[in-house]
């Protein structure tokens, strides 16, 4: 079911029933639970949305939702002409924790909903748009901070609340690479940086990069670059002379 297009920004409190409803709409929607939780499904993703998180649902994104028990949710509906987020960034929605920025936004939106006016909504929507454009995804941040640990699609998909089968295609939309290639490229760049900047032995470098021994590091690096790490380092030093 496609909801009609929207002309004006709407900010109001809503409640949901225990029965699942499904639809999509031609405008953006933000959900800020105030009480209780919302069970929500989009393509490849299942979320139990609580008051410490919010969810952005992009236009044309089919979603199912319900809430069991007492609930109240602050909802912001934004017409397409007022805010358009690039599809590759939005995917099937953005869920994030309420950090100080989003907590402030929720408070200001709540005040607008109480007043029943739209005086500041356009300005708040612009703040929200700028924030979303610079949004960083939790699983990508996790990769960077756990680069040389064992990383699985299952684990990364869980962080984003996606099904593993959907996660890889979603990830490629965000980065232009598969998760495996993205991780491999990051690891290789870090290995090159360490070989260039550090004076430690190759054994120490390989251990820092998470390899069990020097031979496995050498095989991996040679396969990735076409030359062994010792030759790569010597080439760097000779180029600097």
From Swiss-Prot:
Domain of life: Bacteria
Regions recorded as binding DNA: 154-175, 202-225
The keyword Translocase is annotated on this UniProt entry: no
Any Pfam family the entry gives: HTH_18
Entry keyword annotation includes Transcription regulation: yes
Gene3D superfamilies assigned: Homeodomain-like, Jelly Rolls
Name the record gives this protein: Uncharacterized HTH-type transcriptional regulator YobQ
Assigned keywords, A-Z: DNA-binding, Transcription, Transcription regulation
Residue ranges occupied by any Cupin type-2 domain in the UniProt entry: 22-78
GO MF annotation terms: DNA-binding transcription factor activity; sequence-specific DNA binding
Domain HTH araC/xylS-type: 137-235
